[in-house]
A protein has these predicted regions:
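Cytochrome P450
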Residues: 1-155
């Protein structure tokens, strides 16, 4: 869903896409920004294993907590005053939450980053232009946000 979501964003921003093509060294940073922005895994729930507090709110053992990764990836305290905007030149100073964190960090993170990087490097090498050729349909899920189908026209 990272790649299809990223293609949707780049199709809507042809000037950003061209800048990326002109500066292929910026692709790894752009992948991080697109991960932050697209956030395919929107949230995850956990069961609290011991009484604790989260942000001064008491949480009891056995309670469920839902971590909203997409919301965390828009946090102005972490990503600055423009956290609500896609900026392919944003310096990745704060790790995004697209792959989770801690012991539950996604084992496929390096592979997904590599796949996206190679996709954008190849698009840049070939100077591929593309447009979205119709509306995307999305998976009916609160956990995963990703297109089920999205038509593109490449040239």
């Amino acid at each position: 869903h990272l790649m299809s979501g990223s293609l949707i964003e780049l199709a809507a921003r042809p000037a950003d896409r061209e800048r990326l093509y002109d500066q292929p060294d910026a692709i790894p940073g752009a992948v991080e920004e697109l991960l932050r922005w697209v956030t395919p895994i929107q949230q995850f729930a956990r069961t609290v294993t011991a009484d604790t507090e989260v942000g001064a709110v008491p949480v009891a053992e056995g309670d469920y907590l839902v971590m909203l990764y997409a919301s965390g990836n828009r946090d102005e305290a972490a990503f600055g005053p423009t956290a609500g905007e896609l900026d392919l030149t944003r310096a990745p100073t704060t790790p995004n939450l697209a792959f989770g964190f801690g012991e539950h960090f996604c084992l496929g993170a390096a592979l997904a980053r590599m796949e996206a990087r190679i996709l954008f490097e190849e698009l840049a090498r070939r100077r591929m232009t593309f447009t979205q050729a119709g509306a995307a349909t999305y998976l009916p899920s609160s956990l995963v946000r990703g297109p089920h189908e999205v038509p593109f026209t490449f040239s």
